[in-house]
Amino acid sequence: MAWTPLLLLLLSHCTGSLSQPVLTQPTSLSASPGASARFTCTLRSGINVGTYRIYWYQQKPGSLPRYLLRYKSDSDKQQGSGVPSRFSGSKDASTNAGLLLISGLQSEDEADYYCAIWYSSTS
């Protein structure tokens, strides 16, 4: 089987109600099957990643977005129905970013990935 890189695309940015970029994501990421991928969703200055739930979605051409997971902390997270455990969430406080980690990449993971945030005052 020939080596084929996976191209995983990300939404370049999301806008908030004030029409200022709130979240930024790299435009694309390429990785090999079997490798791991790490997607970042960086919140703008003044928005603390620690107080937000980060939601991740996957969208393939011609399909609706699929909910993958929600992550705020190790004690406040949720995996989407039927989503394999090789998809996981995390945060990097030093860069004020939410992370989507995919281990053991498969060809079926080639898709667009989107993040969204929701404020949560609960611990």
UniProtKB/Swiss-Prot annotation:
Q: Where is this region: Framework-1?
A: 20-44
Record key words, sorted: Adaptive immunity, Cell membrane, Disulfide bond, Immunity, Immunoglobulin, Immunoglobulin domain, Membrane, Secreted, Signal
Query: Does Nucleotide-binding show up as a keyword for this record?
Result: no
Which Pfam families does this one have?
V-set
For the region Complementarity-determining-2, give the residue spans.
71-77
Outline the segment boundaries, as ranges, of region: Framework-3: 78-115
Q: What does this protein do?
A: V region of the variable domain of immunoglobulin light chains that participates in the antigen recognition. Immunoglobulins, also known as antibodies, are membrane-bound or secreted glycoproteins produced by B lymphocytes. In the recognition phase of humoral immunity, the membrane-bound immunoglobulins serve as receptors which, upon binding of a specific antigen, trigger the clonal expansion and differentiation of B lymphocytes into immunoglobulins-secreting plasma cells.
Give the protein's recorded name.
Answer: Immunoglobulin lambda variable 5-39
Say which species the protein is native to.
Homo sapiens (Human)
Q: Which gene encodes it?
A: IGLV5-39
